[in-house]
Structure formats: structure tokens, C-alpha cells
């Protein structure tokens, strides 16, 4: 897809999210019940007024087939709903809901996603998405693969350890203002980050995203309905997703062509960007994305701390959209980019451009 100015106007009108290191007192249904209720109540809608519901989660992570069916209890047992699900990050569920709204049969949609990696082994789960013949049987962990990518960038002189540390420091300082940030510190120092030992060479602990449990809920509305529900909706001006080759060996891992193309098709260059929320598993990946999106000093990056501060499998991408949307709705920014990624080494990328009026 492409710039939405030739399509039906759709906006984010309400968001709710929560992330923590370990969800020890509630399960996924209880977590999402609160988030979905908060999301609906903030704009005064009931489930009867929601035309479509779409969720994103992982059966592999939950360890149970069709696990998302249980989480539908958080939406409510009644009334019956028009519902769909993607085994992907919630950002891709939002794309499906956006397409549904384009058809014109409904005016509102609820999107939510969640993950509880503390209950299992995220490195084993993510290994199953690799090439089933040559790579997955070796069970390489996601951080080791990301470390190979970082080493390629360093050896080619495209990034430095200093730039990686600066990116990690930015995340921790920005995250200090975000109650959902699991790893944050106003007092973090560049010297301390540089002196950290590598845990997956060349990545230090601060270079790797902080795994967190959590979830996110978003309500979309079209046209006049959006204006009636929200004083300042965050309009989706463009949304697109692209994918690179599944085979790591045929890709240039120092780049992300799919991220570049998705941003271009979404209309990144139509106006200035006040904010960018980008989704990367490592500081090196954030640097790749900043280059692919050609972000300059006028664009503030990851004011929430990004996924380096809190990374919830299946929800981090949707949370990036919610972070941009919430700042537009509150009037803090006028235009922003939200990015979500899936697969190893930035294989598949979604870009959403949001604007206020």
C-alpha cells in the first residue's frame, strides 16, 4: 500500500499500553481486558460500536494452538463480533484493520496485541522463523544473528561502537520519562556503556533490547466518526509494509531495503517529521533504520526509549504506533513515523505515517 490521501481517511483515536519485566500477577486475558476497556472508555464507545476487531499474538510464545481465542475473552463475551487474527506483531493487525476500514463496511476497529515472553524461551521461539532446511535446525539465537549483523556494520566502517553506545544512552535517558520502560536511567553515562563487556560480541547488554511482557490496544475510526470521537485524531496518512529475502546469505545485512521502500511508499518525504518511533532489536539496527529513513536532527527518535527500553514480542511494533499517535492526539507533535519489524535482521518492515490537523 501507499499514501492514503487517495483512500478513505482513517485515524487512531485512542491508545492504551502496558509493559513490565514480568507479568507475575495477571495473565494475558486480564492484562488485555484492562487495556481494551481503557481504550474504549477513553473515547466513550462500547464493543457494540466496534465494527471490526483484529489481534496479533504468537501461539509459539504461548505454547498453545489458537491461544488467541482465549484472549478474546478480554474483548467481552457479548455481543458477537467480526474478528480476525494475525500471527504477527500487532502493527500488521492494524494494517489489516486499516484495509477493512477502506472497504467502507465499518467505521471503527479495535486492534490489540500482546506477548508474555517471560513464560517461555523467546530465543527458541524466534529460531523457528528461520530457514527450515539450513538455519533453523542449528537453533541459532536471535541475539547471535543480530550480533553478526552488527559485526558486518562495524567491519565495513558504517557504524562505530561509540555510535551504538550513544544510541543506547539515548534510549535509557528517553525511557526515564516512560512508565513502561523496563530499562531506563537519567544518569546513564557514555563511559559506563562503552566499558560494558560484550555479551554477544560485539553487542553489549545495553545494545540489546530489554525483553518485556505487555500489550497494546488501539482504536481506529474513519472520517467523521474519528472527528466525533477524538478532538485531535492521529490520521494515518500513509502505511506500507515490504519484505526482504528469507535467506540471510543473499541479503546485505548492513541495509534494510524493505524498510526504505515501505517508508517511501508510505510518503515519508511529503513533509517534515517531528518524531520517529523505530523498532529495532539492537542499537545497530536502530542506526540502520535511521539511515534508511534519512532521519535528520529535526526528527526526535524514540522519545519513549524504543524497544531497547522495553521489547514485547508481538506488541512492540503496535506500541511504536501508539507512542506516535498519543503524542499527536495530545498536541505534542504534528507528524510522525512509526515503524515495526518482523523476522531476523530487519527482514520485514512496516511504516506508518501519522499526522494531526
Feature locations, PLM:
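Claisen-condensing/thiolase-fold acyl-transfer catalytic domains that form or cleave C-C bonds
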Residues: 2-9, 29, 33-34, 40, ...
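Generic N-terminal amphipathic, Lys/Arg-enriched alpha-helix
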Residues: 8-24
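Signal peptide-proximal N-terminal region
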Residues: 38-49
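Flexible, glycine/charged-enriched surface loops at secondary-structure junctions
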Residues: 47-48, 159-165, 178-183, 232-233, ...
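Flexible glycine-/small-residue-enriched beta->alpha junction loops
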Residues: 109-157
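Short, well-ordered, mixed-charge alpha-helical segments that flank or form enzyme active sites
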Residues: 117-121, 173-178, 345-346
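Short, contiguous, pocket-lining structural segments
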Residues: 138-145, 156, 163, 185, ...
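N-terminal leader/propeptide and maturation segments of large enzyme subunits in energy/redox metabolism
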Residues: 140-189
Amino acid at each position: 500500500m501507499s499514501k492514503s490521501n487517495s483512500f478513505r481517511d482513517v485515524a487512531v483515536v485512542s491508545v492504551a499500553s502496558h509493559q513490565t519485566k514480568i507479568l507475575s500477577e495477571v495473565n494475558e486475558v486480564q492484562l488485555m481486558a484492562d487495556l481494551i476497556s481503557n481504550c474504549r472508555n477513553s473515547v466513550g464507545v462500547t464493543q457494540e460500536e466496534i465494527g471490526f476487531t483484529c489481534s496479533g499474538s504468537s501461539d509459539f510464545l504461548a505454547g498453545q494452538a489458537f491461544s488467541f481465542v482465549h484472549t478474546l475473552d478480554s474483548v467481552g463475551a457479548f455481543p458477537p463480533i467480526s474478528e480476525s487474527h494475525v500471527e504477527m506483531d500487532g502493527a500488521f493487525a492494524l494494517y489489516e484493520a486499516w484495509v477493512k476500514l477502506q472497504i467502507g463496511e465499518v467505521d471503527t476497529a479495535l486492534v490489540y496485541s500482546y506477548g508474555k515472553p517471560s513464560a517461555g524461551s523467546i530465543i527458541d521461539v524466534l529460531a523457528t522463523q528461520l530457514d527450515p532446511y539450513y538455519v533453523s535446525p542449528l537453533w541459532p539465537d536471535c541475539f547471535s544473528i543480530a550480533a553478526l549483523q552488527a559485526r558486518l556494520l562495524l567491519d565495513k566502517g558504517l557504524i562505530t561502537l561509540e555510535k551504538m553506545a550513544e544510541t543506547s544512552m539515548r534510549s535509557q535517558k528517553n525511557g526515564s520519562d516512560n512508565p513502561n520502560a523496563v530499562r531506563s536511567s537519567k544518569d546513564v553515562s557514555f563511559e559506563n556503556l562503552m566499558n560494558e563487556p560484550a555479551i554477544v560480541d560485539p553487542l553489549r547488554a545495553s545494545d540489546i533490547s530489554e525483553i518485556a511482557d505487555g500489550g497494546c490496544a488501539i482504536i481506529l475510526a474513519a472520517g467523521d466518526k474519528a472527528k466525533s470521537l477524538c478532538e485531535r485524531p492521529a490520521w494515518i496518512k500513509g502505511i506500507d509494509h515490504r519484505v526482504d529475502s528469507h535467506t540471510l546469505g543473499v541479503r546485505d545485512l548492513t541495509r534494510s531495503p524493505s524498510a526504505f521502500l515501505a517508508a517511501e511508499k508510505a510518503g515519508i518525504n511529503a513533509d517534515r517529521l517531528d518524531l520517529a518511533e523505530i523498532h529495532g532489536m539492537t542499537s545497530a539496527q536502530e542506526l540502520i533504520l535511521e539511515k534508511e529513513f534519512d532521519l535528520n536532527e529535526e526528527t526526535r527518535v524514540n522519545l519513549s526509549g524504543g524497544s531497547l527500553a522495553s521489547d514485547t514480542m508481538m506488541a512492540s511494533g503496535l506500541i511504536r504506533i501508539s507512542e506516535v499517535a498519543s503524542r499527536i492526539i495530545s498536541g505534542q507533535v504534528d507528524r510522525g513515523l512509526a515503524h515495526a519489524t518482523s523476522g531476523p535482521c530487519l527482514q520485514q518492515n512496516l511504516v506508518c505515517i501519522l499526522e494531526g490537523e
